Amino acid sequence: MNPGIDLQGTFIETVQSLGIPAGAAKALWMPLPMLIMLLAATVSVLVVVWLERKISAAAQQRIGPEFIGPLGVLAPLADGLKLVLKEDVVPAKADKLLFTLGPAIVVIPVFLSYLILPFGQNLQITDVGLGIFLWIALSSVVPIGLLMSGYASNNKYSLLGGLRAAAQSISYELPLALSVLAVVMMSNSLSTVDIVNQQAGYGILGWNIWRQPVGFIIFWIAALAECERIPFDLPEAEEELVAGYQTEYSGMKFALFYLGSYVNLTLSALLFAVLYLGGWEFPISLSVISGLIGVPESTPWLQLIFATIGIGMTLLKAYFLIFLAILMRWTVPRVRIDQLLDLGWKFLLPVSLVNLLITAGLKLAFPVAFGG
């Protein structure tokens, strides 16, 4: 296991070397990870929106965004600026308090979930021992905001969209949690860092995708449903509900929903990479690479290179999954609401439960391979 680089310790030592007391150095560090997280999540949304528009254009034999910056890279920024500057309209008969709180309750838990995401051994905001439990708890808050937004709009399409969104989120949260618990069982920990470390040592052969072939499929399907991506975009089906729970929203409040959907997609892809694709781990073990080049793995400059490339590996795996999600938008049709709920309750839930029981049995029978 690569011990990695302690960014917090390095930052505090560097600041102390400038004559600043230790307490002040720690106080300077505290807001820094949060600001980096907010900035990184926002930039990732801009990248994903640009990718979606370009890939969608390619699927339809169009060019897509082209003139707003090189290759249209500034088009998402222009979209965001337009939404921020638009008038914030509240329907006359809407419940103004719930109408305002709804988007915030949807977006804030998604951003807080980034707290547990590791990009390296010490490259995360906080390594809480109950990281997976915290993520599941935060994700369970989102349906409340969706239902509040649909109800508060005083619009039949918004209400139906909110009810659909809440039902869909609750239906797929259980299979999602059970598939993740199988990984937690093998790792003997709820920490995302420990889950990645459990996959280290054997390169690509040690990744959980091989030990959880059913679990990773369940996780991906449930994650797409939680993100309301096609074929599971029932809450905002344009042909049926105009825009679902977002129908009456405009300006900054609509921008929060727009931002939250893409932040959630990026979060799901990053979690998939951490849980099943080894996170920052290379397809070839780091010990093998250091042996081939004849440099000890503990060498500081080599650790710095590994940490930098490790961030790239995590993002590469995540963006590959995002590419698949965008591609699915143009290759599969939308399911009906009854098919959606049947898939969640009658198929994914029992299969994920059986997968968890089988994982427990394999853990007892083959403790070395399944983390006994």
Swiss-Prot record:
Record flagged with keyword Transmembrane: yes
Query: What intrachain disulfides are recorded?
Result: none
GO MF annotations, alphabetized: NADH dehydrogenase activity; oxidoreductase activity, acting on NAD(P)H, quinone or similar compound as acceptor; quinone binding
What this protein catalyses is: a plastoquinone + NADH + (n+1) H(+)(in) = a plastoquinol + NAD(+) + n H(+)(out); a plastoquinone + NADPH + (n+1) H(+)(in) = a plastoquinol + NADP(+) + n H(+)(out)
Q: Which domain of life is it from?
A: Bacteria
Q: How does it sit in the membrane?
A: Multi-pass membrane protein
Q: Name one Pfam family in it.
A: NADHdh
One biological process term from GO is: photosynthesis, light reaction
Protein localization: Cellular thylakoid membrane
Q: Which InterPro entries match?
A: NADH_UbQ_OxRdtase_su1/FPO (IPR001694), NADH_UbQ_OxRdtase_su1_CS (IPR018086)
Q: Indicate yes or no for the key word Transmembrane.
A: yes
List the EC numbers from the record.
Answer: 7.1.1.-
**Chief location of this protein within or outside the cell:** membrane
Give the residue spans that cross the bilayer.
31-51, 65-85, 97-117, 128-148, 176-196, 254-276, 304-324, 347-367
Keywords carried by this UniProt record: Membrane, NAD, NADP, Plastoquinone, Quinone, Thylakoid, Translocase, Transmembrane, Transmembrane helix
Q: So what family is this one in?
A: Belongs to the complex I subunit 1 family.
Q: What does this protein do?
A: NDH-1 shuttles electrons from an unknown electron donor, via FMN and iron-sulfur (Fe-S) centers, to quinones in the respiratory and/or the photosynthetic chain. The immediate electron acceptor for the enzyme in this species is believed to be plastoquinone. Couples the redox reaction to proton translocation, and thus conserves the redox energy in a proton gradient.
Q: How does it assemble?
A: NDH-1 is composed of at least 11 different subunits.
Report the protein name in the record.
Answer: NAD(P)H-quinone oxidoreductase subunit 1
Q: What is the lineage of its organism?
A: Bacteria, Bacillati, Cyanobacteriota, Cyanophyceae, Leptolyngbyales
